[in-house]
Structures are given as structure tokens and as C-alpha cells.
A protein has these predicted regions:
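Charged, compositionally biased interaction regions
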Residues: 19-296
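Core active-site phosphate/anionic-ligand binding loop and the adjoining beta-turn-alpha structural block
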Residues: 14-18
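Internal mixed beta-strand/loop scaffold within catalytic domains of large alpha/beta enzymes
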Residues: 1-13
């Protein structure tokens, strides 16, 4: 924006065929003014090798299969209709269709490539929200929750941007509500969301079977669901009404489910009829080659 505000073109680099962790961190809400490339190094266990673009001076991951250097003129100077695309929610969206505006263009100045480049692509997929087996946003959200003063968090998981689950060991009345509303507002989960679920420490937040069981047995719909309106959303939201999209009011509502034992009478809550996690793991390990135990 600082270039466009001065009427100048903004130098850019577009890279293709990246390490999957580079892609994962590129759209993760890390701390402001922190480098995504530095965070990649922290995840892969060593510095990410980069080159400086000869024309722009911008960093280019050295393992990229293709890299393009160029500049983006202000949209008022040049822009074009684009899209829609098969986006992560599982619908055709984005581009001009999503924003109602023409999109910026890149004036290509140089192209660098490997022979026979291998590209990592995604066809339009349904039901959407396909993920690689790396979820840095969950760890970042956990850190942000603890920084916000939320105590005794035992697990955090973003199943998709639409569903965040936080497991806590309840310490005081209102603890679950505090955790749920904090998860809703921390930057790692604030945008594109729909549902937040708070569960007790006996529930594995990564296991949807356990999370759904907690929601079905510990949530009283009249008292354990909070609705929060006016939250940070995106033009890619398929449920956004046309009127809000046209006025560029890219906000939505969220639901927070408190799927926990009520703190005030948690000691009187029925005991679960399940063996301990440790015993289950021991049995599966001992008899797994004989009995086809269901996963999860």
C-alpha cells in the first residue's frame, strides 16, 4: 500500500513449487512484524535458504521451482477482472466475483525456472478446506491464548478455518467462557471463522469423534452457546449475503460451544463409561495385529 499511496508500482516476487511448510506459513497469522520465512526455519529445524531477486531485492526461497519478478501498478492505473476460483471453502469464489472489484495485475520483468519444474497444485476440490499434515496456526493460537492470560490449556486445534477447538482444565467459574471468547479474537483464528468449541481436558481436540461426542452430551443449547456478531470474515465466505458483499461489510457471526462439564456442579456430572487413554493405547498395541480396532 505504501507504494500505491504514492502512485508507484509495488515490486513483487511470485514463487511456485515451494516447500509445503513455506505455503502453510504464508497464510498463517503470525505475530505482526515477524517474518514468515524466519518462522519456516523454526518449523523445518534450520534456516530456509533464500536468494535475493536481482531486480527487486526481495527474498526468493532457493528451492522454488519457478520464480517471477515484477511489479504491481496501483489498481487505479491498471487492473482486470479475475476469477472465480475453486476456493478452500469448497465453492467457486474470490477474485472479482468475491470483492466486486477488478484485481491487481503483475507486470512480469523476469522469470527464473528449473528444467522440468515440479509444481504443487490443487484442483478445485470438494468439500474444500483440504490441509497438509501441518497446522502451524494451532500452535500460534495456543501461544496467543497463553499470552492473553488463559490458564491451563491442554490442547488447541484448527480443523479448518471454520472450526477451532480448545481443550482446557477448568480452574474457576467462567474459565471456559474466557477461553472461548479469547480464541474467537486472537489473530490466529479471528478471520474466516464460524465455530469455536471449548472442551474439557479428557477430550482430544484433534479427534472430531471425541469433539462431537462432547458437544452432543455436554452442551445445553439454551445456555451453552454464545453468538457473537460483526466478526472479521472474508469475501470468500459462501454464506455472506449479497447485500453485505456489495457494501464490503465482510463480517459474519460466530457460535461458541461450551462443551464442558458445568463448573458449578462438575463433581456431580456423570462419570464417563470409557477406559483411560493409556489403557486403550496399551490394548491396541498388544492386540492390534489380531483385532481390527477402529481408528480414533
Amino acid at each position: 500500500m505504501k507504494y500505491w499511496e504514492q502512485g508507484k508500482s509495488c515490486p513483487v516476487v511470485a514463487t511456485f513449487g515451494l516447500h509445503p511448510i513455506v505455503f502453510a506459513l504464508s497464510h498463517t497469522k503470525i505475530a505482526w512484524e515477524h517474518s514468515e520465512l524466519d518462522n519456516v526455519g523454526g518449523v523445518i529445524g534450520g534456516p530456509l535458504e533464500i536468494l535475493r531477486g536481482p531486480l527487486t531485492g526481495l527474498p526468493i526461497p532457493a528451492s522454488s521451482e519457478i520464480a517471477i519478478e515484477g511489479e504491481v501498478p496501483p489498481p487505479s492505473v491498471e487492473s482486470r477482472a479475475e476469477g472465480p476460483f475453486g476456493e478452500w471453502p469448497g465453492y467457486y469464489s474470490g477474485g472479482t466475483l468475491g470483492t466486486g472489484e477488478p484485481q491487481p495485475v503483475i507486470k512480469v520483468k523476469a522469470v527464473y525456472y528449473r528444467n522440468d519444474p515440479i509444481l504443487e497444485d490443487e484442483a478445485p476440490l470438494w468439500p474444500g478446506a483440504v490441509k497438509i499434515d501441518a497446522n502451524p496456526a494451532s500452535g500460534i493460537l495456543w501461544d496467543q491464548l497463553e499470552s492473553a492470560g488463559i490458564q491451563d490449556i491442554v490442547g488447541v486445534y484448527n480443523h479448518t478455518p471454520y472450526l477451532t477447538v480448545v481443550a482446557i482444565k477448568q480452574r474457576y467459574a467462567g474459565h471456559a467462557k474466557q477461553a472461548g471468547h479469547a480464541a474467537l479474537t486472537c489473530s490466529a483464528a479471528a478471520r474466516n471463522g464460524r465455530y469455536v468449541v471449548v472442551v474439557d481436558e479428557d477430550i482430544d481436540p484433534t479427534n472430531m469423534k471425541e469433539v462431537l461426542w462432547a458437544m452432543m452430551t455436554r452442551v445445553d443449547p439454551a445456555t451453552n452457546i454464545d453468538i457473537v456478531d460483526g466478526c472479521w470474515s472474508t469475501p470468500l465466505d459462501p454464506r455472506m449475503p449479497p447485500s453485505k458483499r456489495e457494501s464490503k461489510d465482510h463480517t459474519n457471526s460466530r457460535a461458541i460451544f461450551f462443551a464442558v462439564r458445568p463448573f458449578e456442579w462438575r463433581d456431580k456430572f456423570p462419570k464417563t463409561s470409557r477406559t483411560s487413554r493409556e489403557l486403550r493405547e496399551e490394548v491396541v498395541k498388544k492386540f492390534g495385529n489380531v483385532i481390527p480396532f477402529p481408528k480414533g
